Amino acid sequence: LLDREGGKPLNRVDYANTFYRELDDAEKAIEILETMRTDFLQMESMVRVQGFNRKTMKKGKWARWEKTYPEIISSLVFIYRETNRLEDAEIILTGWVNRNPTDGNAKKILDEVRSGG
């Protein structure tokens, strides 16, 4: 299910969360989510440089990924905090806040993470 080319990115986030919650496999969940985060950033860079077309990225696919990106970040931060990987959570949150400087909730969580929680 994870390797299907046509699979929806939001479904993969759900699979990652299932690995964490139901199978108690934080490492697999993090691997899935970090791969997705990297894939998103690469696609974003490609779209900025090359735009949309059949060979690079279709608008519908990009819209699905854009919609899913906050869920990827949220899930990563949650799992990192739950597994006491606060430095990793801080890195992810710092990147998010830099991209979304008006997100007060993310800033609050970042402050909590920086203070050890």
Regions picked out by a protein language model, each given a short descriptive name:
Residues 1-8, 37-67:
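Flexible helix-coil transition and linker loops at the boundaries of alpha-helical arrays
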Residues 7, 25-28, 61-71, 102-105, ...:
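Structural signature of alpha-solenoid helical repeat junctions
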Residues 11, 45-46, 72, 106:
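TPR alpha-solenoid repeat register
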Residues 19-20, 80, 114:
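Residue at a conserved register position within TPR or TPR-like alpha-solenoid repeats
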Residues 15-19, 76, 110:
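Structural register within alpha-helical repeat arrays
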